[in-house]
């Protein structure tokens, strides 16, 4: 056997169960059950006919990579995420796995999910609909007062408009042109109902397939913190959303500083995550979290929910660029030992049990909020403001020029009558399956309608 490397120096965490499990009493590769990745690294060194020692410094991943980069160590004790910034400092070996970003959250009971589904309207949406009802009622009162038609009190018209909104009546106006501002407000009210009520209901019906959780993306977590009172839990030396957030998401995180609970590296995060409306951030190897939702702590009912947008990242050991031949020889050895990594890891921890393996989690759910349509509302209000200005100018012009002369010709300008009505949506008949309705005869009557059922 060819001689290998002698006295390689490995550096990393002192304790990061199940990957590293060292103590002040035993800080070497010969410790009993030193951790899955420490044992795997030692097994690979033995195949390389190499020896190594562990630098007795409790260093996190960033500190370990810096030490490998400046020559204080030769290789990391555990695998690390392979990123472009780190590749500028060190070389990476053949990946031994993947890591998935995700969120730690206590299981949400089905009753709570059902309650979340039923709470379709927020206060801002109710305020919009109520204000539209009052505006439409006031405009109806104004138009009927101007044109002297069906004079009612202001409260009566507001009650009629709100009733029409609740029943989703169609509102039709035939004249005058200036009164189209009224139908504009009516259509905007219908837009709020359709985009918020019906679309959000559909979103939550899809979301009910995701039993146990109400979000699976960073945007969903941020919306829960912004609008639903959730608290973000970030642990020192752990994974944070700043590792993978885009600029807009990072800005939202900065605005949510008051909603973030920072805890120490030695604190038990499960004590906080077991409370209502608390969510933590983590990343698990693919062999531990094999499905989209898994039990991180079965007894505490804490789930690990994979992020549906972020792609997994490689996990590999970082080696010093200046140690000639170390990476190549290590990679050749890993080609033989990699298949046994699962066996080594299973001696320390089993894969987390799947929470909902049957349910398909392939869809990315977007929970619609009123804020998603702010730009559309702005454009609508701008156009309606223009329409109101035109309406006022038309009334002023009417008052000033009832009779005017232009190039010797007399003209009369008057506003046409105000005509409006509520109309129920047309009733549409949907026949049952396998039912054929024959064409009507000329002498048709409802009593002799013929139907043929296809078997």
From Swiss-Prot:
Main location as per UniProt: membrane
Compartment annotation: Membrane
Protein's name in the database: Uncharacterized protein T25E4.2
SUPFAM superfamilies linked: Periplasmic binding protein-like II
GO cellular component: membrane
Keywords, sorted A to Z: Glycoprotein, Membrane, Transmembrane, Transmembrane helix
Segments crossing the lipid bilayer: 127-147, 153-173, 177-197, 377-397
Membrane topology: Multi-pass membrane protein
Signal peptide: none
Organism: Caenorhabditis elegans
Highest taxon above the source species: Eukaryota
Glycan-modified residues: 42, 49, 70, 403
Organism classification: Eukaryota, Metazoa, Ecdysozoa, Nematoda, Chromadorea
UniProt KW Glycoprotein keyword: yes
Coiled coil: none
Pfam families, sorted: SBP_bac_3
